[in-house]
Amino acid sequence: MKIIEVDEELYQYIAAQTQSIGESASDILRRLLNLPTHATSSVDFFESVASAETPKSAVHAEPVLTEKTTEVSQPKVEPVEPPKAVKKQSDEAINHIVDKVRALLNSAEFKEEPKAVVRFLSILRTLYRTNPESFAQATESLQGRTRVYFARDEGTLLVAGNHTKPKQIPDTPYWVITNTNSGRKMLMLEGAMQSMHLPEYLIDEVRPYFVSN
C-alpha cells in the first residue's frame, strides 16, 4: 500500500461530490473518472469527510492510491448500518408535516437567515415537534456503525471528538453534529425526511437552501 498526500483544495472537491450518505471515496472517484463500479467493501466517505476538519488532508483515514492509478483503497472501517425499517405514517400525519415545513420555508425569518446551520436546526426542530415518534425512528435509522449523527445528549457526539461541533436542536431533546458543509447537511435532512416518508417534492423544496460549499 502506498500513501499519497492530497492537498486541501482537491480533498474538499472530492468531498463536495458526495451524492449519498453511503457513497464511498472509491465510488466517488470511479464516478468522476467514468470507471465501472467495483464491488468491494469500502468506507462511507460521508463519514470520513465529516469527521476530518484538518488543514492537511494526508491522514490514514483518507483514500490511498495503490500502484495502479485506476484503483482506490480505503482503511478497514465498518460500513454504515443499512437503514432500519421505520413505521409508515398516516397520510394525514404526513400532510401535517408537509404543511409545517412549508410554513417554515415560506417564513420571512427563515428566508432571511444567512447561516446554513440555523436553517438546518430549524428544519430538524419542525420535523421533531410535528411528529416526535417518527423523527426518533428516522434519526435511529441514520446511525452508522462508526459514526453517530444524532443523539439525546452532547456527550455521545463528543466521543468522536470536539470537531463534531454538536448543537442541540432547539426545543427538542436531540443533539446533532454540525461540522459538515451545506451539501452534507442536506444529505442528513434528506435521509431523515425520506425515513419519515415525506414526499420527494418537499425534499426538493428544501434543497435550494443547502447548496454545497
Swiss-Prot record:
GO terms for molecular function: DNA binding. Its main location: cytoplasm. Keywords: Cytoplasm, DNA replication inhibitor, DNA-binding. One of its GO terms (cellular component) is cytoplasm. The keyword Zinc does not apply. It comes from the Bacteria. One of its GO terms (biological process) is regulation of DNA-templated transcription. Negative regulator of replication initiation, which contributes to regulation of DNA replication and ensures that replication initiation occurs exactly once per chromosome per cell cycle. Binds to pairs of hemimethylated GATC sequences in the oriC region, thus preventing assembly of replication proteins and re-initiation at newly replicated origins. Repression is relieved when the region becomes fully methylated. Homodimer. Polymerizes to form helical filaments. This is Negative modulator of initiation of replication.
